[in-house]
Every structure is written in C-alpha cells, then in structure tokens.
C-alpha cells in the first residue's frame, strides 16, 4: 500500500505500464480506522474516484487533500467484505498493510462508501480479479483504459456500429505435426478452396456375356423388356439403374435330324 505515488500533477491517475483500468466509480468516500499512529493524511473522509486494475485498487482524491492518491495491492489486502446497510449507502471494508517505502507504516482498516452506487459491482469484480491474480491468471477484460506515464489516460476508440472492437485473441499453440492442417486457403476472401468435382465416368462398358449366340426373336424381346424397365434419373445423369441381370439363355443347338443331313 502506497501513499501519494499514483497521481500526476494535473490530477490524473498513474498506473503501471503493464496494467490498465478495468473499472472505476466516482463519488466514493474513503475513511481509515484502527491505526496506532494516525498520520495527518489519513485523518478525515476522503472524497474522489476509485479505480480497479488487474493487481490493485487505487483511490484518487478530489481537491487539495493531503492524501492525493492511495494504492492498495491485492496481496496486502485481507478481510474484504461488501456491506449493504438498511440505512445509508453500500460500502466495502477490509484491512490493508503498508508496503516498504510506501509512505506510511503499520496497517489500517479502510472503508470505501459508494454514495452514488456501484459498491456491489465493484466489490464483486475486485474479489474476482484478486482471485485470478493470486492464481497467476490474467484477469478477463484487462484491456480497458490505457494510461500514459505522465498520468494522462487514453479512452477506448469510439464505437463502430454500436459495438466496441474485440480484445486481441489468445495466441493458441501450434498444432502437433500429426495434426491435419485442413484444406489450403486462397489469397482472396473466398475462404477454403473447394475440391474439384469427380471425373466424368464416361460411357458405361457393355456387360461381360457368354459366347456369342444367334439372335432369336425371343432373345430380342427379352432385351427390349429389360431396356424398358431401366430407370434414368435426370438429377443424377451419370448413373442408370438397371434391374438385376438375368443369366444368358442356353446356347442354341440344331435338332438331331438336321445334324444327319
């Protein structure tokens, strides 16, 4: 926890270069209790704005208060609670310890009162982010306001068509060598290359039949009947559905009396 180390001369808030503002609320009052030796900067009620980053809470006072800024890293905070009294505004309370070189010593109980609302939203988000930070995870939504070293902050770009730009995607690891890479991509915006159509099968080969036999009126009638029963689908011109093939007729043998002539 540090005193007067997170504000600029122009009244702006200063955060680390690797952090960003996840959430902020105005009209917040900060008070301290349970201190053995109360420094002048910790006396009275501070009014200002509270900010939430991925790793700490920062309070920025309004006006010429002796406490211009107050920073509380999550690892020095404990016993945080969200209170909803019957009378009065909701508030967040807890205990914080001083860090080495932070401008004060010991520990103190703090109380953040949200006079214009937002204590529940801020408190729940703070507890969630603190839990993620303790596990070494990057809090979701850590792409809010960007702050310059001078303390001036840059707002997000204006919305386009009512929607904010999406945050940068997570860099997933490359697939293993045996992973199928998928079809190749085209240079343009056409997406995937469609596979070529199957080759045209060409004319159907005549079925294999037995030895040539002399054509008879009965055989021709049988063939005509089979051709008439075939089915052709215009939607699938490469296939013709035929009935089950019948065995060829027996070979023709002349009568015995003709062999003797």
From Swiss-Prot:
Q: Which residue stretches belong to region Disordered?
A: 196-261
Where does the secretion signal sit in this chain? none
Where does it reside? Cytoplasm; Nucleus
The main place the protein resides is cytoplasm
Is Repeat among the key words of this record? yes
Cite a single GO BP annotation: response to estrogen
* The entry's keywords: Cytoplasm, Deafness, Disease variant, Non-syndromic deafness, Nucleus, Phosphoprotein, Repeat
Which disease is the protein involved in? Deafness, autosomal recessive, 107: A form of non-syndromic sensorineural hearing loss. Sensorineural deafness results from damage to the neural receptors of the inner ear, the nerve pathways to the brain, or the area of the brain that receives sound information.
**Subunit and partners:** Binds to the WW domain of YAP1, WWP1 and WWP2. Interacts with NEDD4. Interacts with ESR1 and UBE3A.
According to its UniProt entry, the function of this protein is described as: Acts as a transcriptional coactivator of estrogen and progesterone receptors (ESR1 and PGR) upon hormone activation. In presence of estrogen, binds to ESR1-responsive promoters. Synergizes with YAP1 to enhance PGR activity. Modulates expression of post-synaptic scaffolding proteins via regulation of ESR1, ESR2 and PGR.
Per its record, how is this protein called by name?
A: WW domain-binding protein 2
The top of its lineage is: Eukaryota, Metazoa, Chordata, Craniata, Vertebrata
């Amino acid at each position: 926890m540090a005193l007067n180390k997170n504000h600029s001369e122009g009244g702006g808030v200063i955060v680390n270069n690797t952090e960003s503002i996840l959430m902020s609320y105005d009209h917040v009052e900060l008070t301290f209790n349970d201190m053995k030796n109360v420094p002048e900067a910790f006396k009275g009620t501070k009014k200002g704005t509270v900010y939430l980053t991925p790793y700490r809470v920062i309070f920025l006072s309004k006006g010429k208060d002796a406490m211009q800024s107050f920073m509380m890293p999550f690892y020095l905070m404990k016993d945080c609670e969200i209170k909803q009294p019957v009378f009065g505004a909701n508030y967040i309370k807890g205990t914080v310890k001083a860090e080495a070189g932070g401008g004060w010593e010991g520990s103190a109980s703090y109380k953040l009162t949200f006079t214009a609302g937002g204590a529940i939203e801020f408190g729940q988000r703070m507890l969630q982010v603190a839990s993620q930070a303790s596990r070494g995870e990057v809090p979701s939504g850590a792409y809010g306001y960007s702050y310059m070293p001078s303390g001036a902050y840059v707002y997000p770009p204006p919305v386009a068509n009512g929607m904010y730009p999406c945050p940068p995607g997570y860099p997933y690891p490359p697939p293993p060598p045996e992973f199928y890479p998928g079809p190749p991509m085209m240079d343009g915006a056409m997406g995937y290359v469609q596979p070529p159509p199957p080759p045209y099968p060409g004319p159907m080969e005549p079925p294999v039949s037995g030895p040539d036999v002399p054509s008879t009126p009965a055989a021709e009638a049988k063939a005509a009947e089979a051709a008439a029963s075939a089915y052709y689908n215009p939607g699938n011109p490469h296939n013709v559905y035929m009935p089950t093939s019948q065995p060829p007729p027996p070979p023709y043998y002349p009568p015995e009396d003709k062999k003797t002539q």
